[in-house]
Amino acid sequence: MNIQALINDKVSQALEAAGAPTGSPAAVRQSAKPQFGDYQANGVMGVAKQLGTNPREFAQKVLDVLDLDGIASKTEIAGPGFINIFLSEEFLAKQAEAALADPRLGVASEEAQTIVADYSAPNVAKEMHVGHLRSTIIGDAVVRTLEFLGHKVIRANHIGDWGTQFGMLIANLERVQQESGEVSMELADLEGFYRESKKLYDEDEEFAVKARGYVVKLQSGDEFCAEMWKKLVDVTMIQNQRNYDRLNVSLSRDDVMGESMYNDMLPKIVADLKAQGLAVEDDGAQVVFLEEFKNKDGEPMGVIVQKRDGGFLYTTTDIACAKYRYEELGADRVLYFIDSRQHQHLMQAWTIVRKAGYVPESVSLEHHAFGMMLGKDGKPFKTRAGGTVRLADLLDEAEVRAAQLIESKNPELAEDEKKAIANTVAMAAVKYADLSKHRTTDYVFDWDNMLAFEGNTAPYMQYAYTRVASVFAKAGVSMDDLQGEIKITDEKEKALIAKLMQFEEAVQSVAREGQPHIMCSYLFELAGQFSSFYEACPILVAEDEAVKQSRLKLAALTAKTIKQGLSLLGIDTLERM
C-alpha cells in the first residue's frame, strides 16, 4: 500500500470539505524528523493564502473534517499551518503483516501502460566504453521497476548502425577478405579495424572513392554491401551482449531497434513536412524553422531535416523514431536515457513531431538525461594514457579488486565461492555507484568508495541483506515459516515498520521520475533503521516467544524488501559474503 497516496487522498477530501477549491494540492510528504510525525500535509498554507484566511485557523478547519480513523493515532498543527500526522501502531502492524504475506510485499500493480524505453545505444564496429554505462544501467533499473509495477515495457536499443562510415568499413572488410579469405573478427579487432579503415579513407584516394560508392550501394539495398553490413552488426552485438550479461542487464538481441530501422520512413517524413509547410528549402537543404528556439541573433532556429546532397540527419531519424513508437508500438510513454548534452537536439525533434501531428500531447516523451562519469581529477574518466576506457576492461578491474576485497575479508572460503562472490560484488559495486547518484549530476568514479563496506555502497547493502538473513540461520527457522503476529513494543520497531511501509512510494517514484537513486537512498535508510532496531530490540533472546516471532517477522520483511529493491536495480544479493 502507498500510505502517502492514501493520506494525500484523505487530506484532499478534507481540504475540499473545509472550503478549498476543488483539486487543491494536499502536498503530503514524508516527515523529515520523527517529532513531526510520519507524514506532513503542507498544502494548507497555499490554500489559505488563496482564500485570504489565517493558515492555522484554516488548518484547524481541515483537521475538524479529516478522517484518519484506523490510520493515525495523532494529528497536530505545527508552525504556520503544517499538519503533522502520526501513524497508529495497530495500522502499521497490520500493514506489515499484509506486506509479509504478499509476494509483492504490498506493492500494488498499476494500470498497465505501453512504455518504450530507449537505452544503451552503442555504435556498431566500436566497443562499448564507460560512456555507455550510465544509459545502460539507469535505463535497465527503470525498466525493471516499470515491469514490476505491471507495465508493458518495450526495450529499444537504438544502436548506431547506419551512416557514411559503413562505406569505409565495408571496403576494408572486402580488402581483408580478399587477402586472407573469410574473416572471423572479435570486436577488440574491430576497434583497430575501424581505425585502419579511417586511415585508409583519409590517405588512399582510390579506397575513399570505393568507400563512398559503397555508401550509395548500401543505401540502395545492394546485396553484397547488406551482407557485409550485417556481419559488422552481428560481431558488434555478440560482444555487447557479453557486457550486458556480465552486468546483469536485461537487454538482448531481440531488443535492437537501430537507426537503420527507420530508413524507409525518412523520405516520406521530409515530403510530409514540406507538404505541411513546416519544412522549407534553404540554401538547397530542407529546413524546419522553430520559433521555440532562437539562434544567436534572436531569430528562429533552423533545424535541417535533409541536406543539400539528399542525405538525412539524426534529427530526421529521431522524428521517424518517435512517430514509429507511437503509431506502430502504441506507446503511452517514451523514455529516452540519453546524456544531457543531447537535450536541445531531442527537444527540437520532439517539437517538430508535435507540430506535424505525429505524436499527440497525450503521449509523454521524456528525456531522462544524465551527467558524465568523471575521474578523480574532475575530468571525463580516461585511461592513464588518456584514452577511452573500454567497458570490458572496467568490469575486469572491478572483478580483480572485488576478489582482493573478499580474500581479505573471508580467506577461508573455497576458491570457487570466493570467485562467485567477487563477481557478484564487482558488478553490483560498479552499478550501485552510478545508480545511487542523482542521474542528472556528474559523478566521480572512485574504486575505494564504491567497494567500501561503509556508506551508501553495494557491498554495504549486500552485507546488510546477508546480516539480516543470517538471523534465520542462527534461529534455525525459515523466514517463510514464521508464526504469531507482529506487535509493536518499542519505538525502534515502529520506526522500522514505518520505513518498510515506504517501499511502494520508492518504487513508484523511480517509475515516475526515472531516478534509481531514490531506491538506493530508500534501501540505505532502511538498512540504517534495521541496524538501530537490531541493537535496541533483541531478536533471538527476546523476553518472550511472541516478541521473538514478531521481531523475526520484521527481520524477514526487511530482508525481502532489500532483496526486492536491489533486484529492481539489477543487483543480486548473497547469502554470505
Curated annotation (Swiss-Prot):
GO terms for biological process: arginyl-tRNA aminoacylation. GO terms for molecular function: arginine-tRNA ligase activity; ATP binding. It catalyses: tRNA(Arg) + L-arginine + ATP = L-arginyl-tRNA(Arg) + AMP + diphosphate. It comes from the Bacteria. It is an enzyme of class 6 (ligase). Keywords: Aminoacyl-tRNA synthetase, ATP-binding, Cytoplasm, Ligase, Nucleotide-binding, Protein biosynthesis. The keyword Aminoacyl-tRNA synthetase applies. Its EC number is 6.1.1.19. One of its GO terms (cellular component) is cytoplasm. A motif ('HIGH' region) lies at residues 122-132. The keyword Glycoprotein does not apply. It is found in: Cytoplasm. Monomer. Belongs to the class-I aminoacyl-tRNA synthetase family. This is Arginine--tRNA ligase.
